[in-house]
Amino acid sequence: MAIRKLKPTSPAKRQMTVSTFEEITTNQPEKSLLEPIKNSGGRNSYGRITVRHRGGAQKRHYRIIDFKRNKDGVPAKVATIEYDPNRSANIALLHYVDGEKRYIIAPQGLKVGDMVESGPNADIKTGNALPLANIPVGTMIHNIEMKPGKGAQLVRAAGNSAQLMAKEGKHALVRLPSTEVRYLPIDCKATIGQVGNQEHENITIGKAGRKRNMGIRPTVRGSAMNPNDHPHGGGEGRTSIGRPAPVTPWGKPALGYKTRDSKKASNKMIVSRRKK
């Protein structure tokens, strides 16, 4: 998908780029696969802010995506490639031969009219979903499950792909886009190929208004606040933060502080950590 640079009719638009949406074949989503989304504005059930800098997003519908790919042995035809406002990747509408319709993440190279299938006996071709046990070593994959039958959790963003490195007993060794190498149960399903919409990472937002449409509000620097609002706040004029290193609004180290649980059960599945 190509990127278009806008004419500099304003200072914001001088650097702004947008997608040309060449791969999109329709702007009318399948109504039976839509659900409403309630904008929480970053508040929990008590009305308190639990996530800062959220609110005011453009209203949108959620597209129900088939991450489980559990319709084994039933071929499906790609009917449309569509834009999804809830994710960076595009989505593809599948029409199964038994009449059911489902959305999947659109892989790179998938076109309208292509046939896809899932199950252990499916062919090794883009868009097909198979257990890791049935995928050849070295294959590029995406939409990977972490528990068999739970649905894909890994490698779902635009342009991403992982590589199946080896198979050892009940586990498969997979290298993720972050360069982390980890074991996954060999019965977990994955989809062949790379996630589409590769050019997404090259889009320049350009202006604050586009971020507001995404539901992201401004981030105020801690040093611009009062001392009762942030540990960096206070002082006369522009002063230093008065600490050895920056901290969060709650006093925890802001840079390089590991937040992952050292006793997490899945730690033993990680062979090598990602490169910083």
Curated annotation (Swiss-Prot):
InterPro entries for the chain: NA-bd_OB-fold, Rib_uL2_dom2, Ribosomal_uL2, Ribosomal_uL2_bac/org-type, Ribosomal_uL2_C, Ribosomal_uL2_CS, Ribosomal_uL2_dom3, Ribosomal_uL2_RNA-bd_dom
Keywords, in A-Z order: Ribonucleoprotein, Ribosomal protein, RNA-binding, rRNA-binding
GO BP field: cytoplasmic translation
Gene Ontology cellular component annotations, sorted alphabetically: large ribosomal subunit
Disordered: region residues: 219-276
Gene Ontology molecular function, alphabetical: rRNA binding; structural constituent of ribosome; transferase activity
Pfam (any one): Ribosomal_L2_C
Keyword Translocase: no
Oligomer and partners: Part of the 50S ribosomal subunit. Forms a bridge to the 30S subunit in the 70S ribosome.
Annotated family: Belongs to the universal ribosomal protein uL2 family.
Function according to Swiss-Prot or TrEMBL: One of the primary rRNA binding proteins. Required for association of the 30S and 50S subunits to form the 70S ribosome, for tRNA binding and peptide bond formation. It has been suggested to have peptidyltransferase activity; this is somewhat controversial. Makes several contacts with the 16S rRNA in the 70S ribosome.
Protein name according to UniProt: Large ribosomal subunit protein uL2
Organism: Alkaliphilus oremlandii (strain OhILAs) (Clostridium oremlandii (strain OhILAs))
